[in-house]
Amino acid sequence: MGYKGKWNERFKNPYVNEKLLKKIRKMNETGERKIIKTWDRACTITEEMVGHTIAVYNGMKFIPVYIQPEMVGHKLGEFSLTRTFRGHPDKSAKAVKKK
């Protein structure tokens, strides 16, 4: 089977980590708001998560992500970047290396 792309995602059920959802439901009942750490970048953001701060691991450290209503339906990993762009090298430095 080939790549189905974004079209197929509309028909698939969203993946939500049960442990994470259980913690959020418990915090919603008590009215508590504390940072929840998770390594699960593939977890889909649901309406229950709105208003919570979830620290998502990016491979080096946990990045706190405050969940807003516009984020519902996206993945947690989309808001925790894994790569840092340090810029392109200067042309003068490149010319010196060639000599």
From Swiss-Prot:
Transit peptide found in the keyword field: no
Q: Which terms are listed as keywords in the entry?
A: Ribonucleoprotein, Ribosomal protein, RNA-binding, rRNA-binding
Top-level division of the source organism's lineage: Bacteria
The record's listing under SUPFAM superfamilies reads: Ribosomal protein S19
The residue range of the signal peptide is none
Q: Which GO terms describe its molecular function?
A: rRNA binding; structural constituent of ribosome
Residue ranges of coiled coil: none
By its UniProt entry, which Gene3D superfamilies does this protein fall under?
Answer: 30s Ribosomal Protein S19, Chain A
One Pfam assignment: Ribosomal_S19
Q: Which NCBIfam families match?
A: rpsS_bact (TIGR01050)
Similarity-based family: Belongs to the universal ribosomal protein uS19 family.
Name of the featured protein: Small ribosomal subunit protein uS19
Source organism (scientific name): Persephonella marina (strain DSM 14350 / EX-H1)
